[in-house]
Amino acid sequence: MSKNLILILNCGSSSLKFAVLDPKTGDEKLSGLAEAFNLEDARIKWKLHGEKGNADLGAGAAHSEALTFIANELLSEELRSSIGAIGHRIVHGGEQFTSSVVINDDVVKGIEHAIQFAPLHNPAHLIGIKEAFRIFPELKEKNVAVFDTAFHQTMPEEAFLYALPYKLYKEHGIRRYGAHGTSHLFITSQVAELAGKPVDQTNAIICHLGNGGSVSVVRNGKCIDTSMGLTPLEGLVMGTRSGDIDPAIVFYLYKNLGMSMEQIEDTLVKKSGLLGLTEVTSDCRYAEDNYEDASKPEAKRALDVYSYRLAKYIGAYMAILGDDHLDAIAFTGGIGENSGHVRELALNHLKLFGVKLDVERNLAARFGKSGVITADDSTFKAVVIPTNEELVIAQDTAKLAL
């Protein structure tokens, strides 16, 4: 039997997303999510050959139990024997990894070294790798790491350096790394296809907007700047993350309000963003649904700040491209693909550049529908393109391990 399928694992600190798909066609045989790890109600849900199912994993279950369930209960002998390799999404690869790699001892050490930049995610990825080796021993030499930071490693120094003492970069690797690179890479290829150009001649500004959010600017198919920084905390307003703030706010919270560093980190990472601005929820849909409701001013406040910050990044990146033709401003991710309101508010700030929204096209582009959302006489195109990070991971894994 042909081993032409890829098992994809995306291990978070308390969850595991998984899929089995054909890297050539994108055909998905299995997909699912195991969540609430280490809690009483640890559970798993899946879609197998189009049929949905769910099960309890047992109190305290985590990555090991979830992967064991997938292997024993969801993968038939035929499906398992068709899997030729395993692709792991890795949030942070530091400077060491500029592309996807087959996992060996040195790669594991590199992922361990980058834990300092992704303390929640990278340890979970390492658990996923270890468990994949144990549960699928026949594929031990066929595990591939696909790094979210790799796409951004083409940034020039002026984009990735912070104006800090240079030795902090040379000795400790403190610099801009970015995130969501797998999504930005996929959307770049889709913009190229839309423009009828080779990827290495494509220029784009890509807005990946979900609970986390980032913008990148691409020249000739390569990332030249991105909004996330050393960690995924920098940049846009996000669901619970603050994005850009005056660094001195940290000193103020510590000295004047008596907050500990742990409390400050918790505030910036888990209690800010849309949640902080609304004081109700991190869900963008609340702000959209109540935007015109005068009795809920927090909704308009949150969406206006969110969209304004987004527009600032898009405008700055348009300036950075200079004379290079911009093929498209692309929106993707849960909010980018579905929130016509956010797209409208952000693009309305860019009229100086000749960006002209088509209201009907913008409203139509949602729920998985892609398309151009600007008017025919707009100076630049804005498009909505659903992302497919799993397909990129599968394709990279297939190139290296099949």
Curated annotation (Swiss-Prot):
PANTHER family: ACETATE KINASE
Entry protein name: Acetate kinase
Keywords attached to this entry: ATP-binding, Cytoplasm, Kinase, Magnesium, Metal-binding, Nucleotide-binding, Transferase
One CC-aspect GO term: cytosol
Family: Belongs to the acetokinase family.
Primary subcellular site in the record, as a coarse category: cytoplasm
Subunit-structure text: Homodimer.
Sequence positions that bind ATP: K17, H208, L209, G210, N211, G212, D283, C284, R285, G334, I335, G336, E337, N338
Record pathway: Metabolic intermediate biosynthesis; acetyl-CoA biosynthesis; acetyl-CoA from acetate: step 1/2
NCBIfam families per UniProt: ackA
Source species of the chain: Actinobacillus pleuropneumoniae serotype 5b (strain L20)
Database matches in HAMAP family: Acetate_kinase
Binding site for Mg(2+): N10, E389
Cofactor note: Mg(2+). Can also accept Mn(2+).
Reaction catalysis annotation: acetate + ATP = acetyl phosphate + ADP
Active site positions: D148 (proton donor/acceptor)
Listed Pfam families: Acetate_kinase (PF00871)
GO biological process: acetate metabolic process; acetyl-CoA biosynthetic process
Requisite cofactors: Mg(2+); Mn(2+)
GO MF annotation: an example: magnesium ion binding
Site (Transition state stabilizer): H180, R241
Function: Catalyzes the formation of acetyl phosphate from acetate and ATP. Can also catalyze the reverse reaction.
Signal peptide region: none
Subcellular location: Cytoplasm
Residues binding substrate, per UniProt: R89
Upper lineage: Bacteria, Pseudomonadati, Pseudomonadota, Gammaproteobacteria, Pasteurellales
